[in-house]
Each structure stands twice: as C-alpha cells, then as structure tokens.
C-alpha cells in the first residue's frame, strides 16, 4: 500500500514530519511507501509553496519518506485543499493507495488494516457542513440527485435508507481527511472532472450554495460511488479510531482527543532528532514541548465536551492558548 500525504511550506512541513514520526513509532513493521507530495513553484503560487526546511526534509527521508514534487494545474493558492487531489498524480498508476490529511498521526498498526482496494471509501468523521439548505431552495435530495445525474451516476443506490428523507446522513458524504482507492490516476482524473464541473458549470440546484472550502468533499462521494465504493465497513473502523487520529489543530487535539492519541503524539515527537525539527514551528514548540497543550487539556472533560467545536475553540481562546 502506498500512503500519500501533502507537504508544503510552513505548518505542513512540520505536520508531515510528525505524521512520518508517528508512523515509524506506531507501526515499525510498515513496509509500504510513504510519499510526501511537495508542491512545486508555478504560476498558481504567488510564493514558493514547497518544503523549505532542509532539516525537516532530511528527517522525512531518514524516516523512509519519499518527497516528490507535483505541479498545481487547476487550484494552487486559490484553493489549497485541491492539493490533495492534484498530488495524486505523483503516485504510480494502478497501485492501491490511501491518502491522509497531513494533520493526522498513526496510533496503531496501519499495515494491518485490510483495505479493499476495489471498493474505495473515505472518512465518515464528518458533520453536516454541505449543502446548507435554504428555506425556499432545493433540499438535500434534489441537490445530490442533480450532481449524480450530471455525472451519469445512479443516485438511489448511494442512499442510506436507514436515515429519513431529507436528513443529511441519508446522502453519501465524507470527510476528505482520508480516502483510499485502487488507482490514483483514475481517482485523480475523476476528482478533477467532478471538481471542475462543480466549480465552473454546476447544476442549477447549486445556485445558492457556497462551494468553498468544501469543493473536495462535494466531489469525493461522487467519485467513490462512481468507482463502485461507498461508506466504509467495519474493517476500516481503526481509521479515525485506534489506528489513526485526525487531530487537525493542536489546541483542539489536546482538548478532545483520547489519552492514547495524545500519548502517541508526544512519544513520536520526543526523540531529539524529531524535537530539533518540530521546535522550529512555534505552535508545536509551545503546545508539545513547553506544556501549553497539557494546560489546554485540563480545561475540558473528555466525557462531557461541548457539542459544538466553536465552543471548544472559544474556551481555548479565552485562556490565551489558541495557536495554529
């Protein structure tokens, strides 16, 4: 299995190092390839977008990662989320892959997860972020049907019939924090086609919808369904579970992630060679190494967290601990 994450200047550099460190810490038997796609300079970037820290690059390579440049053809700085799609072009054609957002750590034996490459899937750790239903506008069903129809996909077979009509979970929708498939080139081509359609020539049902920053997550279920995939089965429960943790932002991670996830994060970051690199990124220096993360952790009861993420963010900001 080939693992793909996206590097880049600044924060992404150090998140990539932490991902690689956690993979080697938690799954030393992993024998696949870890590919860090690094955006190359080009007309869609106003300043150099790639990894600039030579020490970080050397440490990634020491961990066995392959840093490979890719070109931004369609998105670049105007939509950085599109990097995860454009980066698929660096992977070898016809070989199964799994993509992870760079703000993820590996907390268990990823090499033992039984990915079924012929049935692509993605993260279900999502909320009702898109579409936003207007009072007099089309509902969930009409919007998602229009998108499926535009790409010639069977809409009915994508539905979760255990959920009521017009409830958002009835309709196939993923978090693009991880996804896997059988062929990155095919996945790349279909994602680009779907994203450009949604951006440049959307169905009329989308006229009131804001597509940013969710463009990748709107296209993802269409591509996965079109390739014969769907919602992940129990074999993949370890992703967003005991095997990987999408921590997103360090203050949020310390506020709400499990004791085990935080212990792995800190253990992976503890070797001196890792510490020397990660301390170059101020939020990691302060949160992980200077104890600010542990102070954030004391503010919250993991068994009784606020329902809305914004409430967690606000509580952290009130204490002066928010950093990214």
Regions found by a protein language model. Give the residues of each.
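N-terminal anchoring/stem segment of glycosyltransferases
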Residues: 1-74, 93, 211, 291-324
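A glycosyltransferase accessory/donor-loop signature
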Residues: 5-8, 160-177, 181-324
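Conserved glycosyltransferase catalytic-site signature
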Residues: 13-17, 81-85, 176, 213-218
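A structural signal for short, well-ordered beta-strand segments and their strand-loop junctions
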Residues: 35-37, 98-101, 106, 122-123, ...
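A conserved donor-nucleotide-binding helix/loop in the catalytic core
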Residues: 69-100, 105-108, 112, 120-125
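Short, surface-exposed amphipathic charged segments that create phosphate/polyanion-binding patches used
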Residues: 80-87, 137-139, 249-253
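Conserved donor-nucleotide/metal-binding helix-loop-beta segment in metal-dependent transferases, i.e.
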Residues: 106-146
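Extended catalytic-interface subdomain
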Residues: 131-182
């Amino acid at each position: 299995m080939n693992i793909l994450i996206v590097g880049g200047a600044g924060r992404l550099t150090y998140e990539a190092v932490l991902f690689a460190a956690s993979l080697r810490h938690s799954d030393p038997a992993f024998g696949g390839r870890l590919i860090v796609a690094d955006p190359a300079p080009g007309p869609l970037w106003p300043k150099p977008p790639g990894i600039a820290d030579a020490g970080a690059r050397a440490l990634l390579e020491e961990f066995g990662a392959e840093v490979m440049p890719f070109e931004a053809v369609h998105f670049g700085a105007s939509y950085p989320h599109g990097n995860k799609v454009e980066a698929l072009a660096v992977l070898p054609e016809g070989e199964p892959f799994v993509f992870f957002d760079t703000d993820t750590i590996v907390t268990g034996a990823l090499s033992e997860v039984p990915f079924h490459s012929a049935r692509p899937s993605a993260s279900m750790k999502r909320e009702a972020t898109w579409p936003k239903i207007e009072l007099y506008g089309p509902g969930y069903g009409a919007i998602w049907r229009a998108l499926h129809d535009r790409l010639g996909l069977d809409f009915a077979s994508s539905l979760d019939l255990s959920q009521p009509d017009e409830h958002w979970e009835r309709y196939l929708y993923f978090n693009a924090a991880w996804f896997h498939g059988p062929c990155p080139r095919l996945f790349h081509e279909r994602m680009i086609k779907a994203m450009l359609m949604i951006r440049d020539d959307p169905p009329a049902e989308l006229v009131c919808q804001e597509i940013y920053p969710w463009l990748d997550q709107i296209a993802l279920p269409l591509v996965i369904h079109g390739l014969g995939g769907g919602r992940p089965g129990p074999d993949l429960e370890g992703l967003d579970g005991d095997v990987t943790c999408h921590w997103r932002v360090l203050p949020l991670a310390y506020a709400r992630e499990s004791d085990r996830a935080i212990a792995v994060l800190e253990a992976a970051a503890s070797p001196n060679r890792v510490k020397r690199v990660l301390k170059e990124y101020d939020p990691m220096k302060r949160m992980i190494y200077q104890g600010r993360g542990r102070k954030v952790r004391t503010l919250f009861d993991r068994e009784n967290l606020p329902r809305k993420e914004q409430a967690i963010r606000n509580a952290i900001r009130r204490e002066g601990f928010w950093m990214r």
